[in-house]
């Protein structure tokens, strides 16, 4: 049972039909539970049935403030640590949903603590672009924290893009959603558009991005190469780049340093509490902030 339907699938009409999506979202936890029982994936079984919070020993998890309702499900929605409400299993299914209940609505403790601290530096009327936005969690957080925020979500999978749209609706927010993949070579790959950062910023009339957040599964360096003009013009204040191999991590870090950006913090996959590494970088046009580093997992 595949609930996350790729673009071009014969079943894609579900994602294009508002009534069918409404039915899907209201039965999603049940559907994901059936999928979980049928697949019996070992990693998801561990996430679902473990009784411990996997992040309880992370100092960054401990530092993040959690509202009293964090991790609880109320009227079919999961409350995250900061009060945002999401579909409980939209982020990678039943196992992750159970994990986020135990972790009190935190799914990436190091990155979330860094993101929280950077948000304190973002002025009103700022714009964020999230690449590989999926459930749009970081965009939701930005929109909640920054007055008069503008949010742009870019995601290549229609079902994932729709999760983000539903989460914005559930939280009473509005945003701009773009169905596209990211690459340095602008093209049409079958039914999927491949776009670059410079192209998207021009197309969407974005003069400045306060945050560009990227989680695009191995295309990180291509993303930076597609932002050549924006980087030269210092049109991006902060980068949050999830990295998916040590080689890509080092290539991206070197590219940013060579472009004059300051690396505020970074950690590799082996140092992370989750499967991704991270690079946080700041434009040299800004006064360099004193960002407390994430605590690396030993």
Language-model region placement:
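Phosphate/oxyanion-binding active-site loops and adjacent basic polyanion-contact surfaces
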Residues: 104-111, 189, 193, 216, ...
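Conserved acidic-Pro-Pro-aromatic motif
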Residues: 149-153, 199-298
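Well-ordered alpha-helical segments embedded in enzymatic catalytic cores
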Residues: 110, 114-117, 196-199, 223-226
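S-adenosyl-L-methionine
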Residues: 1-154, 157-206, 263, ...
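Hydrophobic packing residues within well-ordered alpha-helices of enzyme cores
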Residues: 115, 142, 164, 168, ...
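Short, glycine/acidic-enriched loop or turn micro-motifs at the edges of active sites
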Residues: 133-135, 158, 184, 216-218, ...
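Cofactor-binding loops of NAD(P)H-dependent oxidoreductases
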Residues: 93, 180, 214
């Amino acid at each position: 049972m595949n609930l996350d339907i790729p673009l071009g699938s014969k079943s894609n009409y579900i994602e294009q039909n508002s009534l069918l999506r409404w039915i899907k979202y209201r039965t999603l936890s049940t559907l994901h539970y059936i999928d979980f029982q049928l697949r019996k994936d070992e990693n998801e079984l561990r996430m679902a049935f473990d009784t411990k919070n996997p992040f309880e020993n992370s100092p960054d998890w401990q530092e993040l403030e959690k509202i009293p309702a964090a991790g609880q499900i109320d009227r079919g929605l999961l409350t995250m640590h900061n009060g945002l409400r999401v579909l409980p299993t939209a982020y990678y299914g039943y196992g992750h949903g159970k994990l986020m209940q135990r972790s009190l609505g935190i799914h990436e403790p190091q990155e979330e603590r860094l993101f929280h601290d950077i948000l304190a530096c973002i002025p009103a009327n700022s714009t964020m672009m999230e690449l590989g936005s999926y459930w749009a969690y970081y965009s939701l957080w930005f929109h909640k924290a920054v007055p008069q925020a503008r949010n742009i979500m870019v995601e290549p999978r229609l079902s994932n893009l729709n999760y983000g749209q539903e989460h914005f609706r559930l939280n009473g927010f509005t945003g701009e959603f773009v169905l596209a993949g990211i690459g340095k070579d602008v093209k049409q790959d079958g039914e999927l558009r491949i776009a670059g950062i410079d192209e998207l910023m021009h197309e969407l009339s974005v003069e400045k991005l306060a945050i560009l957040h990227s989680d695009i599964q191995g295309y990180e360096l291509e993303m930076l190469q597609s932002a050549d003009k924006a980087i030269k013009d210092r049109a991006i204040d902060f980068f949050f780049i999830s990295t998916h191999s040590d080689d890509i991590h080092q290539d991206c870090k070197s590219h940013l340093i060579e472009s004059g950006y300051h690396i505020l913090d970074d950690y590799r996959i082996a140092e992370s509490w989750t499967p991704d590494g991270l690079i946080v970088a700041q434009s040299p046009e800004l006064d360099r902030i004193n960002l407390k580093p994430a605590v690396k997992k030993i």
